Amino acid sequence: MNYQILARKWRPQYFRDIIGQKHIVTAISNGLSLGRIHHAWLLSGTRGIGKTTIARLLAKSLNCQNGITSDPCRQCIICKEIEKGLCLDVIEIDGASRTKVEEMREILDSIYYSPIKSRFKVYLIDEVHMLSRHSFNALLKTLEEPPEHVKFVLATTDVDRIPKTIISRCLYFKLQIISEEKIFKFLKYILIKESIDTDEYSLKKIAYHAHGSIRDALNLLEHAINLGNGHVNIKNVTDMLGLLPEKYSFLLTDAVLKKDSKKTMLLLNKISSIGVEWEEILIEMLRFLYHISTSQSFPLVWEKIFTEKYKNQIQKIAQNNKKTNIQLCYQILLNGRKELKFAPSQKIGVEMSLLRVISAI
């Protein structure tokens, strides 16, 4: 059974398929089309947003047997070998495990040999910021005047740790985190292609908790599919992410705003028994209060993904409470979240934050 995880199956194979990096894709594609090819590229950004994918696409574009192109054919031997990770002229190096200067010199000594069957030897150095100072010095000498048949693509999640002298010798591209909306649309597209049932609210939750990373979103989606036995629904997503179930956001916020201490404590005990993390309680209440506040301040155009029940809960609390109380509640809970790490325990921190709201409003 040759099952491919979603992150690999849906890895972009053309520059045009890359999500959320239009400014970078356009610059690289135009450079390839015009024949303005640099000897080194540096890609920086958080995890799972396309650095390695762009690096491999560059390797394919430079070595495609149909010529240097921004649109590799994927049919020639070189393209196929690069996609399978079998091309001997594309050398992927993990900077985190090859930090010693001796190892870097050994690698750099090989650059003077001609490519075996490709147009260029392409060195992809991932997590390049992990290299030692001496390794950077060795790399710098090569980056200054590399052989014509050699190209470098460097990738990092921490560009501040890379010497300025290295950066100045590369075409530097800073990748952006992917917007929640773009991740949501991509997940929806994948599930349609995979013929998997879902609801948009579940995908929105996954997109939010991916924190701008496509790879993280796909891994969460994979988990949700397995948990739901081939389906994705909000209950499984809520359980998987350890989120506060929607109904408790309403009940807890309502109890606090009604200054009902007893009900508040009973609800907290109930919520803790289902395994929700204490900080998550404050996060979900803050998000709920945000929606209440915006619905009070201006006519809110509700997103289609919100359930009718959720909208009704928001509107009910918004109509029955003063704007100042909602704002004060938000401020106290926000400060409570900041102070959570200083509390004797997270349980005590959350309880005291809610009791502080009840005393203040």
From Swiss-Prot:
The keyword Membrane does not apply. Zn(2+) binds at C64, C73, C76, C79. GO terms for molecular function: ATP binding; ATP hydrolysis activity; DNA binding; DNA-directed DNA polymerase activity; metal ion binding. Its EC number is 2.7.7.7. It catalyses: DNA(n) + a 2'-deoxyribonucleoside 5'-triphosphate = DNA(n+1) + diphosphate. Pfam families: DNA_pol3_delta2 (PF13177), DNA_pol3_gamma3 (PF12169), DNAX_ATPase_lid (PF22608). Keywords: ATP-binding, DNA replication, DNA-directed DNA polymerase, Metal-binding, Nucleotide-binding, Nucleotidyltransferase, Transferase, Zinc. Gene3D superfamilies: 1.10.8.60, 1.20.272.10, P-loop containing nucleotide triphosphate hydrolases. DNA polymerase III contains a core (composed of alpha, epsilon and theta chains) that associates with a tau subunit. This core dimerizes to form the POLIII' complex. PolIII' associates with the gamma complex (composed of gamma, delta, delta', psi and chi chains) and with the beta chain to form the complete DNA polymerase III complex. Belongs to the DnaX/STICHEL family. DNA polymerase III is a complex, multichain enzyme responsible for most of the replicative synthesis in bacteria. This DNA polymerase also exhibits 3' to 5' exonuclease activity. This is DNA polymerase III subunit gamma. The gene is dnaX.
